[in-house]
Structures are given as structure tokens and as C-alpha cells.
């Protein structure tokens, strides 16, 4: 199912421009923040000082707090319905079926993330099939925003870490290092991303650790070095996580997404996503 295609003043331009701004788009948002949480209208990377950056980080904290409360208040039955709808959309999508390699997050219930268990199970269900996809999942390396994406073949490859979040052991059952996607010889086609809040201009707000933005930048550098096409960046989102366009503050370190998968379907954001979806 394809959702409404809403375009902001070119997302490509946003990726390249040194000016970070928050346009007012005449579209009805799924969720509106109060005026007090809306970000500063314009920021230039050439004139930002620490005070301005601190202001953006403060705005991010306010948005995170608002969205966390909304997620916590979600009815469990509604959450289950949205989990099923989102995963069904992904599993039936041509861009998912055709991908040969991908990075995907392992959902954590305590973080109120969109469930990915059916997606992962489908990928790992037929390891010897011709349609098998090569799957890489997150392994947090340290507390300094360093994360790796390691290859797994079975759900049994996952163990709970100190925060009770499933992740791959860095070595397999035979004692061999797991393949790191940043050292792989072949590119991946797709990232399935988590997040705390999103808008239809491609802005993504994480949980504040910087792990995904740091990793995505590294993979983009790797792809550029190898001459590979960038993978499609697709985020999964419950309804309360989709904010009014321009409500999410951004910095030069924030990586934009290509598309959203919502309970209502797919929302392509970039021209590439429109072509693929």
C-alpha cells in the first residue's frame, strides 16, 4: 500500500545545503507539537556557535520527551495492530523482496520501537534459499556512539546484552569473527531504521546516542570509496512518531531518510524512493 507522496522543498537540497531550516508545508500532520516545542527557524552551519548548537540539542530533548509520552500512552492493542500493518507492508514491498543485502534493527519492546521480529524471521527462515538475503544487525561497540553491523544467519546468533537488548555475539559458534558490513565485499541495498520521531521531509530524531547517524555516515563513506550506490534508507514509524513537517531540529550530523513505513503504508520522501516504491 502506498501512502500519500508528500514532498518538501527538495530533500536533496537539504542534504547538500549548509543552511538548516524548517519550512512550513501546507499539509495536515499526523501529530502536532505545541508551539513551545517548535524549533528555531533558521541556522547556518557557518555561523553556528556552541550556544546555538546547545539550543538545538535542548529542542531535541523537548521533542524526545513529548514523543516518549505519546508512545507510552499508546493502547497495547493499537500498538499490535500497527506493528502488524507496518511489517506486512515491508514484507510485501517489491523493494524489500528484491534486496539482496540489508541492515535492520532488532526491535526492543521496552524502547517502544516498531516490532521487526516478523521481518527478521522471514529473512532468516530459509537460509539455503535462492531468495535468501544477507542480514546485518547492530552490535554496540562502546559508549562513544560506535556501532557495528554484523552478519547473522539464525535468530540463535543473538544474545541479550546488559540492557536486555538482543544483539549478535561478535564471534560465531566456531569462534570466527562475524562479518562486518563495513568490511564486506558487496554493497547492501537497504537500511531498515528505528527512531523516536520523523517528519515527511526525511528528518529523523534518534534517542540521543548518535549511534545510527555515526554509522550511516561511515557506510556512506564506504559506499563512496567503493563506487557503490547508497542503500535505501527506510524508517519504521508508529502514528504518534510522525510529526508536523519542520518540527524536528537538525544538525549537520543528522542523516536524512528516503522513506517512512507507517501503519497506513509507505511514504516516499526522496525522488529515489518515489522511483523505487
Swiss-Prot record:
**The gene coding this protein:** 5FCL
Give the species this sequence originates from.
Arabidopsis thaliana
Transit peptide located at which residues?
A: 1-48
Q: Which reaction does it catalyse?
A: (6S)-5-formyl-5,6,7,8-tetrahydrofolate + ATP = (6R)-5,10-methenyltetrahydrofolate + ADP + phosphate
Q: Which GO terms describe its biological process?
A: defense response; tetrahydrofolate metabolic process
Its EC top class is: ligase
Protein name per Swiss-Prot or TrEMBL: 5-formyltetrahydrofolate cyclo-ligase, mitochondrial
Among NCBIfam families, the record links this protein to:
MTHFS_bact
Share what the entry says about its subunit structure, partners included. Answer: Monomer.
Query: Which family does the record claim for this protein?
Result: Belongs to the 5-formyltetrahydrofolate cyclo-ligase family.
Q: What are the UniProt keywords, alphabetically?
A: ATP-binding, Ligase, Mitochondrion, Nucleotide-binding, Transit peptide
Describe what happens without this gene. Reduced growth rate and delayed flowering.
Q: What is its EC number?
A: 6.3.3.2
- So where does this one cross the membrane? none
Single GO cellular component term: mitochondrion
Alphabetized SUPFAM superfamilies for the sequence:
NagB/RpiA/CoA transferase-like
InterPro entries per the UniProt record, alphabetical:
FTHF_cligase (IPR002698), FTHF_cligase-like_sf (IPR024185), NagB/RpiA_transferase-like (IPR037171)
Binding-site residues for ATP, renumbered to this chain: 60-64, 206-213, 254
Q: What does this protein do?
A: Contributes to tetrahydrofolate metabolism and photorespiration through the regulation of serine hydroxymethyltransferase. Prefers the pentalutamyl to the monoglutamyl form of 5-formyltetrahydrofolate.
Q: Where in the cell is it found?
A: Mitochondrion
Q: Which residues are noted in the entry as substrate-binding?
A: 113, 207-211
Amino acid at each position: 500500500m502506498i501512502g500519500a507522496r508528500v514532498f518538501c522543498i527538495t530533500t536533496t537540497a537539504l542534504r547538500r545545503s549548509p543552511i538548516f531550516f524548517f519550512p512550513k508545508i501546507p499539509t495536515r500532520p499526523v501529530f502536532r507539537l505545541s508551539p513551545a516545542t517548535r524549533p528555531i527557524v533558521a541556522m547556518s552551519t557557518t555561523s553556528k556557535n556552541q550556544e546555538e548548537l546547545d539550543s538545538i540539542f535542548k529542542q531535541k530533548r523537548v521533542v524526545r520527551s513529548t514523543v516518549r509520552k505519546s508512545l507510552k500512552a499508546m493502547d497495547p492493542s493499537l500498538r499490535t495492530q500497527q506493528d502488524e500493518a507496518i511489517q506486512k507492508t515491508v514484507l510485501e514491498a517489491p523493494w524489500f523482496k528484491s534486496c539482496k543485502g540489508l541492515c535492520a534493527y532488532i526491535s526492543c519492546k521496552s524502547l517502544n520501537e516498531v516490532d521487526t521480529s516478523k521481518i527478521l524471521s522471514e529473512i532468516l527462515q530459509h537460509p539455503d534459499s535462492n531468495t535468501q538475503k544477507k542480514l546485518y544487525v547492530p552490535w554496540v561497540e562502546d559508549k562513544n556512539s560506535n556501532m557495528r553491523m554484523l552478519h547473522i544467519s539464525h535468530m540463535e546468533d543473538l544474545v541479550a546484552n546488559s540492557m536486555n537488548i538482543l544483539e549478535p555475539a561478535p564471534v560465531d559458534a566456531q569462534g570466527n569473527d562475524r562479518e562486518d558490513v563495513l568490511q564486506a565485499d558487496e554493497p547492501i541495498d537497504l537500511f531498515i531504521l528505528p527512531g523516536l520521531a520523523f517528519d515527511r521531509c526525511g528528518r529523523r530524531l534518534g534517542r540521543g546516542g548518535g549511534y545510527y547517524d555515526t554509522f550511516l555516515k561511515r557506510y556512506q563513506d564506504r559506499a563512496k570509496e567503493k563506487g557503490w550506490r547508497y542503500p535505501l534508507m527506510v524508517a519504521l514509524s508508529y502514528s504518534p512518531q510522525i510529526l508536523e513537517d519542520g518540527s524536528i531540529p537538525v544538525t549537520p550530523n543528522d542523516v536524512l531518510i528516503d522513506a517512512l513505513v507507517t501503519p497506513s503504508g509507505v511514504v516516499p520522501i526522496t525522488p529515489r524512493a518515489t522511483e523505487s516504491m
